[in-house]
C-alpha cells in the first residue's frame, strides 16, 4: 500500500534510511531541514502487509529520489511520476535505472557518477596543514563566486550564488577556502549537511594555482572536522584522476549514483 508520509512516520522512516545513511544523505538532510509537510517537499512510502516499509519516494521541488533496501518496484510510483516531463530523478543507480523501461515516464538527460564516502581521518598524512584554511561567511560569497566564474569547467548559474548563500544561512552547508593577497584561490563546500553526514561539492582551484595540492589540503581539513563531529563525508566523482586523490585521503567507493536532468 502506498501513502503520503507524515511526521508520525518519522521514527520508522529514519530507522529505515539510517541503515544506508550515506546513500540516503539527501533524503535524510531534506527531512531534517524541511520536514514532511511543505509545498515544495513531500514523501511517500509503500508498506508491506505487516506495516514495515518497502520503499520511499522524496519530492523536492520538481526533483525526485526513490529508495528501497530491497528490489525496487517502479510500478508503485509510475502513476505519480508520469505527470512530470521530463522527469528529474536521481538515486542509487540500481534503483533509478529501473525507471528507464517504464513506458509512461520521460526521463531527463542521464549522468552516472561514482559515489564514495570517508568514515574517518585514518588515511590522512601525518604532516600538519601548512596553509591557513578559513571557513566562509556571507561576506565571502562574492569572492567565492568570482573564483568559480574564473574556472571554465565549473558551471555557475544564477541559482549557484543563491544556493551557496542559503546553505550558509541555514547551516546546511559550509565552504572552506584558501586565499592569497585577498583573493580566494581554492575552495570546497559541503551541501545537504545532516546529523549523520554531508556531501562534498564545488571542489575548485584557480588555474594559476593548480598542482600545489590546495584542494587536497582543504579536503584534509574537512575530513578532520567531520570526523571530530562523528559524521561521514560523501562525494560524487566521474573523473578517475580526481577519484585517485579522494581515495588517497580515505574515501571509498560505495556504489554508483545516477541523475536524470
Residue ranges and their predicted role:
Residues 1-26, 120-158:
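Short amphipathic alpha-helix that is part of the acyltransferase structural core
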Residues 1-2, 15, 21, 29-84, ...:
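Conserved donor-binding loop and adjoining core beta-sheet/short helix segment
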Residues 22-40, 48, 155-181:
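Active-site rim helix/loop that mediates acceptor-substrate recognition in acyltransferases
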Residues 48, 60-129:
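Acyl-donor-binding surface of acyltransferase catalytic domains
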Residues 72-79, 201, 205, 211-225, ...:
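Conserved acetyl-CoA-binding loop-helix of GNAT-fold acetyltransferases
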Residues 90-96, 233-247, 259-261:
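Conserved beta-strand-loop-alpha-helix junction that forms the acyl-donor binding cleft
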Residues 103-110, 249-257:
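Conserved acetyl-CoA-binding loop of GNAT-fold acetyltransferases
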Residues 144, 172-189, 197-198:
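Conserved active-site beta-strand-loop modules that form the wall/rim of enzyme catalytic pockets
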Amino acid at each position: 500500500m502506498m501513502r503520503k508520509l507524515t511526521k508520525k512516520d518519522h521514527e520508522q522512516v529514519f530507522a529505515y534510511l539510517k541503515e544506508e545513511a550515506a546513500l540516503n544523505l539527501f533524503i535524510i538532510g531534506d527531512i531534517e531541514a524541511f520536514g514532511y509537510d511543505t509545498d515544495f517537499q513531500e514523501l511517500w512510502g509503500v508498506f508491506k502487509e505487516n506495516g514495515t516499509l518497502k520503499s520511499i519516494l522524496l519530492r523536492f521541488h520538481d526533483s525526485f529520489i526513490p529508495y528501497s533496501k530491497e528490489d525496487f518496484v517502479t510500478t508503485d510510483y509510475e502513476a505519480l511520476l508520469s505527470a512530470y516531463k521530463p522527469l528529474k530523478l536521481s538515486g542509487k543507480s540500481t534503483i533509478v535505472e529501473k525507471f528507464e523501461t517504464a513506458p509512461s515516464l520521460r526521463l531527463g538527460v542521464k549522468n552516472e557518477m561514482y559515489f564514495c564516502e570517508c568514515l574517518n581521518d585514518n588515511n590522512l598524512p601525518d604532516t600538519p596543514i601548512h596553509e591557513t584554511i578559513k571557513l566562509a561567511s556571507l561576506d565571502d560569497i562574492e569572492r567565492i563566486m568570482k573564483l568559480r566564474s574564473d574556472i571554465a569547467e565549473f558551471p555557475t548559474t544564477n541559482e549557484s550564488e543563491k544556493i551557496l548563500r542559503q546553505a550558509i544561512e541555514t547551516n546546511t552547508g559550509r565552504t572552506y577556502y584558501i586565499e592569497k593577497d585577498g583573493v580566494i584561490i581554492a575552495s570546497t563546500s559541503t551541501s545537504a549537511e545532516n546529523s549523520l553526514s554531508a556531501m562534498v561539492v564545488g571542489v575548485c582551484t584557480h588555474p594559476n594555482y593548480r598542482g600545489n595540492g590546495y584542494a587536497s589540503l582543504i579536503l584534509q581539513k574537512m575530513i578532520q572536522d567531520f570526523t571530530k563531529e562523528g559524521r561521514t563525508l560523501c562525494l560524487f566523482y566521474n573523473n578517475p584522476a580526481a577519484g585517485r586523490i579522494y581515495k588517497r585521503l580515505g574515501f571509498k567507493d560505495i556504489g554508483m549514483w545516477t541523475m536524470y536532468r
